[in-house]
Curated annotation (Swiss-Prot):
Gene behind this protein: SMC1A
Subunit structure: Forms a heterodimer with SMC3 in cohesin complexes. Cohesin complexes are composed of the SMC1 (SMC1A or meiosis-specific SMC1B) and SMC3 heterodimer attached via their SMC hinge domain, RAD21 which link them, and one STAG protein (STAG1, STAG2 or meiosis-specific STAG3), which interacts with RAD21. In germ cell cohesin complexes, SMC1A is mutually exclusive with SMC1B. Found in a complex with CDCA5, SMC3 and RAD21, PDS5A/SCC-112 and PDS5B/APRIN. Interacts with NDC80, SYCP2, STAG3, BRCA1 and BRAT1.
Basic and acidic residues bias: start-end ranges: 284-293
A biological process from GO: response to DNA damage checkpoint signaling
Name the record gives this protein: Structural maintenance of chromosomes protein 1A
Signal sequence range: none
Biased composition (Low complexity): 953-967
Region of interest (Disordered), residue spans: 284-308, 348-369, 947-968
Modified residues (Phosphoserine): S358, S360, S957, S962, S966, S970
Purpose: Involved in chromosome cohesion during cell cycle and in DNA repair. Involved in DNA repair via its interaction with BRCA1 and its related phosphorylation by ATM, and works as a downstream effector in the ATM/NBS1 branch of S-phase checkpoint. Central component of cohesin complex. The cohesin complex is required for the cohesion of sister chromatids after DNA replication. The cohesin complex apparently forms a large proteinaceous ring within which sister chromatids can be trapped. At anaphase, the complex is cleaved and dissociates from chromatin, allowing sister chromatids to segregate.
InterPro entries attached to this UniProt entry: P-loop_NTPase (IPR027417), RecF/RecN/SMC_N (IPR003395), SMC (IPR024704), Smc1_ABC (IPR028468), SMC_hinge (IPR010935), SMC_hinge_sf (IPR036277)
One Gene Ontology term of the molecular function aspect: DNA binding
Amino acid sequence: MGFLKLIEIENFKSYKGRQIIGPFQRFTAIIGPNGSGKSNLMDAISFVLGEKTSNLRVKTLRDLIHGAPVGKPAANRAFVSMVYSEEGAEDRTFARVIVGGSSEYKINNKVVQLHEYSEELEKLGILIKARNFLVFQGAVESIAMKNPKERTALFEEISRSGELAQEYDKRKKEMVKAEEDTQFNYHRKKNIAAERKEAKQEKEEADRYQRLKDEVVRAQVQLQLFKLYHNEVEIEKLNKELASKNKEIEKDKKRMDKVEDELKEKKKELGKMMREQQQIEKEIKEKDSELNQKRPQYIKAKENTSHKIKKLEAAKKSLQNAQKHYKKRKGDMDELEKEMLSVEKARQEFEERMEEESQSQGRDLTLEENQVKKYHRLKEEASKRAATLAQELEKFNRDQKADQDRLDLEERKKVETEAKIKQKLREIEENQKRIEKLEEYITTSKQSLEEQKKLEGELTEEVEMAKRRIDEINKELNQVMEQLGDARIDRQESSRQQRKAEIMESIKRLYPGSVYGRLIDLCQPTQKKYQIAVTKVLGKNMDAIIVDSEKTGRDCIQYIKEQRGEPETFLPLDYLEVKPTDEKLRELKGAKLVIDVIRYEPPHIKKALQYACGNALVCDNVEDARRIAFGGHQRHKTVALDGTLFQKSGVISGGASDLKAKARRWDEKAVDKLKEKKERLTEELKEQMKAKRKEAELRQVQSQAHGLQMRLKYSQSDLEQTKTRHLALNLQEKSKLESELANFGPRINDIKRIIQSREREMKDLKEKMNQVEDEVFEEFCREIGVRNIREFEEEKVKRQNEIAKKRLEFENQKTRLGIQLDFEKNQLKEDQDKVHMWEQTVKKDENEIEKLKKEEQRHMKIIDETMAQLQDLKNQHLAKKSEVNDKNHEMEEIRKKLGGANKEMTHLQKEVTAIETKLEQKRSDRHNLLQACKMQDIKLPLSKGTMDDISQEEGSSQGEDSVSGSQRTSNIYAREALIEIDYGDLCEDLKDAQAEEEIKQEMNTLQQKLNEQQSVLQRIAAPNMKAMEKLESVRDKFQETSDEFEAARKRAKKAKQAFEQIKKERFDRFNACFESVATNIDEIYKALSRNSSAQAFLGPENPEEPYLDGINYNCVAPGKRFRPMDNLSGGEKTVAALALLFAIHSYKPAPFFVLDEIDAALDNTNIGKVANYIKEQSTCNFQAIVISLKEEFYTKAESLIGVYPEQGDCVISKVLTFDLTKYPDANPNPNEQ
């Protein structure tokens, strides 16, 4: 058996440079401190044996180069080589080199591909993917903690059955799908076989059904031929009768044309008059509109004049105020000028007096030259003696001058403050006057605004009321027009009704209180639903005229005859015989007395209503009406809500469409009232439109009110600003100035007290200085004849100072007065400009008022003229309206003539209409019969035309105007009239039937026979008429499905075979490994435990396919009962995991086994057991290379490889090799040393 002999490393991880490690013995231990690089040596062995980079604790291959992790790679390449030795064979070298970012593989220094490299290693029993040659650090604990599923994955990896998992899953899916397809096609084939059987039965039923259907068709043709034959006979008869009546109508038409021509002429004249009347109405409307436009202009002109007058009054007041200010300012300025003249005069008088005093003083103090020198010398000497005093006096003088300047400044400020206070007082006065003026203007504006608002409110109310009323009138007019439109009274009928209404009014006037009116006008059904029923019961009595007596009725009939009116029915209340109402009928359920569902007025016409209604009952439906009429022992007259009437005699009459039209007359009797309402509303609408036209005037007033409101707002804002800003600010500044003025007095007095006090001190100093001067100048004073030297100096200097001071006072007064005078002049000019401005404003406003008054008068004149023209037009309109009424009366007389002719024409037209209606009905019946034959696919025998010539009526589109519905129907009838039917198949007995009852009896017989045949046909469930086609289709489908089923069955068989093949291969791989491990594990566990009572066994959860489920692993520790793996102690678990690990390794064992710290979790006892086991196995089964930190373990090895670190930029690992075979068990316990 071969073994790993040497490892050569160059710049790999912590191993810098080239290092040769080895030789490795059968049991070699790698030892060294933590962090020295022991695991890196294991990584080197893994690397050279082809392990992936990700399992070497780095991200990229470059990181394996020494120094690369700290950014200082020792070289750009690294490599690891392994020398493998076998007995009787040459050593082989396997090397893996890092070049750039990839690996290069070499065998005996020859570069090979990775797959060749892997194959060579596999030949030696080294499986790269299964990693059967190494155990990483922590792998033992990981194996101990694995669950059954994870153990299965481990076995899949070791046995390489996992490589077949993807192909296994794929083939299993294909097999399942193929089996599903086979099952689907089997069921489909079974279903189609059932369909084939069902189709055969359907075909037999269809043949029988077709025979019965042919018999029904023959009976239908016979019935339809019978109906059509007698229909055509009736149409021919009606056509002859219609032609005769049309000739009579032509004669009456010619007679009516003459009367109508006369009526047309009158209409033209009436039309002309009405157009003239409309023109006058148009002119009235235009003048009215013009007047409505002019009135706002007049109001605006009047408002402008009023506004300008108010403005003028305000300007005059402003002018008066400005003139008052100007006079006051002029007086103040005159006073200042007088004061200026007074000061100038005083100054001149002072100058003159000084001149006189100068001349009057004759004394001359002029010195000689030697005396002057002496004076200066003595003066210098005196100055030296009094130098100290002079310095003190100079200091006092400086202080005194500073205080005097302060005093002058305060007095000047005081004067300026007094002037400012006067100015503020004037401004305050102006502010107060402006406030008074603004308050007066605001009061006036508010009054004007109230007036405008009042006027606006009145106009708004009037216009809004007019708008609302116009909307209401328009709504009412629309309702009236809709109701009038719904009445659908044609022109002739309207004229007839108008004629009858006029006669009715005439006889009411002739016999007041005796003629009550028509029955329809005096009563009304309580609910709309009873209208048709009440109409049916009242019948012809609806239009009967109710009178109080028979005599009144006869007189009325005579009057109608004289007026050539239509015949009328009269119901005299004293002549009618009425049976009393049967009170028992009121107790019947589902019925009411007709008289109880009618309201009537006046009460005494009840007799006439009882006569018309009798004891008739109204019911909700036809069934109730029939039941009550004929169902009891006594018959009653009843009527349903739809108008179906059941007479006691047994006669039943239906609610025809003309009855509904007649029932609408309950609503039509309000037409006259609606017309009157329409006229009244139209007139009111015109009046309201006039009021609505005042909107322009309202907008004008609103605009003026808005302008006035804005001016008022600005004035109020100005007033508020003047009060709160200008006046308040001036008062505040005045108060501040007065406060400052009050402070000037104390400050000036304080300065004056300081100056007076200092003057006293200066006086004392001067006296001391004077004593020194007197001593020095004593002899000199005697020489010049003065008491002391000061008398000489003061005479000359004092006078000059006094004069200068006095002149300064005069100048100050003139300057102050000049400043005030300049200010007053400027203010006076401003006041004069204001006076001039207000004078111009007053003059301009007066001129504008004159113009505005003229404009106001001009608008007033236009309004008066327009109103006069409007009144003239209204008079013309009344005259023209009278002419139109007269012309209407003339036309009414002609209409009466036309009415007589129209009556005869109407009678004939009614007869023609009746014939045409019957004829139209017969044509419609023929059309319906033909259409029914076409729709029911009844093939009639035709001698001319085809069934395609029979038309089906379709509704015309909304936009179709070319052909009306009736015209289209006529075209259809005409086209169908060309169809000739061959009645040869119709029995002669059926053709000979003439009487209506006979025809009806024969038709019922034919219909009954047809019904019996159809009943038999209907009882047979409609078969599938396409049964033959279905049968052929099902046969084809059955053959197709059988083919598909056979193909699916073959595919399923093939897929199952393919799956079984891959399943077997996967099972064989897995089972070979599992059986090997399961067989060896118990023996290995006993050897590791050093006890034959220890047991270990593996069991698959799924014996048939163990790789699909988990693998259970259980151990019984020596001297203990069976417990699950989870309940074993840490050491026991580790020993069990090692047993599994060594058992797995025993399956296709690698020649060497590299283990990284497998003793980490073992106690000393178990360490010894494991070490001894490994030592035993290494002698015969495999070479063991173990990384360990425990002496109890590595002392059992044959050689030691020691790894120690050296410090540099990163850790550098160095290696020492120590052969222990030279010291066999010399020191079994090194700790004793």
